Amino acid sequence: MADESKFEQVKGNVKETAGNVMDNKDLEQEGKEDKASGKAKEVTENAKDKVNDFIDKLKK
């Protein structure tokens, strides 16, 4: 799952850069949204992993 969120961030960065270079504000905005979505997924995944680790420690 982490790979998917990183890929989404990279894809967003490429779109944002391409939109900036081509002066395409829609593509640039779409890239920013993809980056933000990927980052949010990454943060959520990290939090979920920490909660699961904590639960595993409680079980021991």
UniProtKB/Swiss-Prot annotation:
Q: Which Pfam families match?
A: CsbD
Q: Where is the composition biased (Basic and acidic residues)?
A: 23-60
Renumbered residue ranges of the record's region Disordered = 1-60
Listed SUPFAM superfamilies: Hypothetical protein YjbJ
The family note in this entry says:
Belongs to the UPF0337 (CsbD) family.
Stated name of the protein: UPF0337 protein SSP1897
